[in-house]
């Protein structure tokens, strides 16, 4: 059965080896709606076990989609900030833009990664951003991304909306800095999906 979803949504997945459903962001946007891709990083006991327990062709129960990240907000510029595996909702929006046409305003994607594995995912991110008309900025997470970096690249535009998916402490720090540049909390869209 096709799963109708919009970029940025998540589903609950139940695997054969575990009766409990767990939430994961959908990291794809296929026009045929017959395929889904999830990016799952080993962050806890359950996600660590998946690499060992999952087998190709295994049945998985998919519930949802749930959640809503609205990327269709009018602004002079959009800024997307992803911390590590927080890139997943942006991947689905990039695929949507690639298939439906370029964005209506400039978009900057700031991808903050620290570990070597994160630098490799997704392998086609540069190409995907180019095809979607989005400017990619890769930042080593050990170097702190600050509001001043974002605002310099945004030509200090006042009508900027920011979408964030990553650690809560990073979100709080970034929002505090952006508010000093006149970016309101209403213009800061934070994916608070932090269940594991």
Regions found by a protein language model. Name each.
Residues 1-61, 113-115, 126:
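Ferredoxin-reductase
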Residues 87-101:
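Histidine-anchored nucleotide/phosphate-binding helix
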């Amino acid at each position: 059965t096709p799963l109708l979803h919009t970029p940025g949504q998540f589903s609950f997945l139940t695997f054969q080896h575990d009766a409990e459903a767990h939430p994961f962001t959908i990291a794809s946007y296929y026009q045929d709606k017959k395929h889904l891709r999830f990016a799952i990083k080993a962050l806890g006991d359950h996600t660590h076990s998946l690499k060992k327990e999952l087998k190709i062709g295994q049945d998985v129960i998919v519930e949802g989609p749930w959640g809503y990240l609205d990327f269709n907000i009018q602004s002079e510029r959009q800024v997307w900030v992803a911390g590590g595996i927080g890139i997943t909702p942006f991947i689905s929006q990039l695929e949507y833009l690639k298939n439906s046409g370029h964005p209506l305003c400039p978009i900057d994607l700031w991808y903050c990664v620290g570990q070597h594995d994160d630098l490799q995912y997704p392998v086609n991110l540069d190409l995907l951003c180019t095809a979607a008309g989005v400017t990619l900025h890769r930042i080593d997470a050990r170097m702190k991304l600050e509001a001043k970096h974002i605002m310099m690249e945004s030509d200090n535009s006042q009508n900027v909306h920011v979408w964030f998916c990553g650690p809560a402490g990073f979100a709080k720090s970034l929002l505090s800095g952006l508010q000093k540049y006149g970016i309101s909390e209403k213009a800061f869209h934070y994916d608070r999906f932090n269940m594991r």
